[in-house]
């Protein structure tokens, strides 16, 4: 193997392992966030059974579905995030070579910043093309509030993918893809762009204390997450449409979804579950720092 191939493989492995660990740790928070986001578009959750907020959701899930249901859909999330994060981190460096070749970060700050934004956004959008059906399945499995057996909409990852494919074809597995690309570019641009720019401005980036790295990463993930959150809410709502027919279809398209959420639920609805998303972001920040630490020893 060439040095470039070895470097790419190390990036792939380090990013994937870091993501798998952090996502499993924050899976319960992720499920609460998803339920709050999509409950208005769920056929299983009637108006009188909707969750009132994070605490209500955390208390009711183990009572109604069992403690292990906090990790419902987590396998799909880990499978999805191994290639997603690994491809993001790996492609990020490849895109950086394209957008930042020959740029001096000290004398060309704004050119350096723009290059980081572009490389982060392009990396996120590229990886999303490959793993979107897994992202879709993860959302639908987490939104499934049936206790067991016949009450469940899907038996697992494979069952979810097969049922939606039979019902709606490949289009059903990519429902909400366009708004996802918009959101992922905004999120990744901030996630990688600001993080790398901030680290690049430190006196000695290679030997930055892990606490400083974590603080930078935590701020970046919180800001990036809130900025792109409305896009995430719309895409999750669109994902809930797949498999529906006739009058069960709530939104005719992405623009209709934006309009109806704003009209029927108000602007705050776009940010339902956002606080749990900030908490979940601690896992994302941890993954970013863990990736840097793993690379020091590889």
Swiss-Prot record:
Q: Which GO terms describe its molecular function?
A: ATP:ADP antiporter activity; oxidative phosphorylation uncoupler activity
Task: List residues binding ADP.
Answer: 80, 92, 235
What is the topology of this protein in the membrane according to its UniProt annotation? Answer: Multi-pass membrane protein
Q: Which residues carry this modification: N-acetylthreonine?
A: 2
Task: Report the transmembrane regions from the record.
Answer: 8-37, 75-99, 110-130, 179-199, 211-231, 274-291
The GO biological-process annotations, alphabetized, read as:
adaptive thermogenesis; B cell differentiation; chromosome segregation; erythrocyte differentiation; mitochondrial ADP transmembrane transport; mitochondrial ATP transmembrane transport; negative regulation of mitochondrial outer membrane permeabilization involved in apoptotic signaling pathway; positive regulation of cell population proliferation
N6,N6,N6-trimethyllysine, modified sites: 52
Where N6-acetyllysine occurs, the residues are: 105, 147, 163, 166, 268
Instruction: Output the PROSITE patterns linked to this UniProt entry.
Output: SOLCAR (PS50920)
Residues on the membrane's Mitochondrial intermembrane side span 1-7, 100-109, 200-210, 292-298
The catalysed reaction is: ADP(in) + ATP(out) = ADP(out) + ATP(in); H(+)(in) = H(+)(out)
A GO CC term assigned to this protein in UniProt? mitochondrial permeability transition pore complex
**Residues spanned by motif Nucleotide carrier signature motif:** 235-240
Write out the domain note. Answer: The transmembrane helices are not perpendicular to the plane of the membrane, but cross the membrane at an angle. Odd-numbered transmembrane helices exhibit a sharp kink, due to the presence of a conserved proline residue.
Subunit structure comment from the entry: Monomer. Component of the MMXD complex, which includes CIAO1, ERCC2, CIAO2B, MMS19 and SLC25A5/ANT2. Interacts with AK4. Interacts with TIMM44; leading to inhibit the presequence translocase TIMM23, thereby promoting stabilization of PINK1.
Q: Which family does it belong to?
A: Belongs to the mitochondrial carrier (TC 2.A.29) family.
Describe its function.
Answer: ADP:ATP antiporter that mediates import of ADP into the mitochondrial matrix for ATP synthesis, and export of ATP out to fuel the cell. Cycles between the cytoplasmic-open state (c-state) and the matrix-open state (m-state): operates by the alternating access mechanism with a single substrate-binding site intermittently exposed to either the cytosolic (c-state) or matrix (m-state) side of the inner mitochondrial membrane. In addition to its ADP:ATP antiporter activity, also involved in mitochondrial uncoupling and mitochondrial permeability transition pore (mPTP) activity.
Q: What is this protein called?
A: ADP/ATP translocase 2
What lineage is on file? Eukaryota, Metazoa, Chordata, Craniata, Vertebrata
Name of encoding gene: SLC25A5
């Amino acid at each position: 193997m060439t040095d470039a191939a070895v470097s790419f493989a190390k990036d792939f492995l380090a990013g994937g392992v870091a993501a798998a660990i952090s996502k499993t740790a924050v899976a319960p928070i992720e499920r609460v966030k998803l339920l709050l986001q999509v409950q208005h578009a769920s056929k299983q959750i009637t108006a009188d059974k909707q969750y009132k907020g994070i605490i209500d959701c955390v208390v009711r899930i183990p009572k109604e579905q069992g403690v292990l249901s906090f990790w419902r859909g987590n396998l799909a999330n880990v499978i999805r995030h191994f290639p997603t994060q690994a491809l993001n981190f790996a492609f990020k460096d490849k895109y950086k070579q394209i957008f930042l070749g020959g740029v001096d970060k000290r004398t060309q700050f704004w050119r350096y910043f723009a290059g980081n934004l572009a490389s982060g956004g392009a990396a996120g959008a590229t990886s999303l093309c490959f793993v979107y059906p897994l992202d879709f399945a993860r959302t639908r499995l987490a939104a499934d509030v049936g206790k067991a057996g016949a009450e469940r909409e899907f038996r697992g990852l494979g069952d979810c993918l097969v049922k939606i494919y039979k019902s709606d074809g490949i289009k059903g597995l990519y429902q909400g893809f366009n708004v996802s690309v918009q959101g992922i570019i905004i999120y990744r641009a901030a996630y990688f762009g600001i993080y790398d720019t901030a680290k690049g401005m430190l006196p000695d980036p290679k030997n930055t204390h892990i606490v400083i790295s974590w603080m930078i990463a935590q701020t970046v993930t919180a800001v990036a997450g809130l900025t792109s959150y409305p896009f995430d809410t719309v895409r999750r709502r669109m994902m809930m449409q797949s498999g529906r027919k006739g009058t069960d279809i709530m939104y005719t398209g992405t623009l209709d979804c934006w309009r109806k959420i704003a009209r029927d639920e108000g602007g705050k609805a776009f940010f339902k579950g956002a606080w749990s998303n900030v908490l979940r972001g601690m896992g994302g920040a941890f993954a970013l720092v863990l990736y840097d630490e793993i690379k020091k020893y590889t």
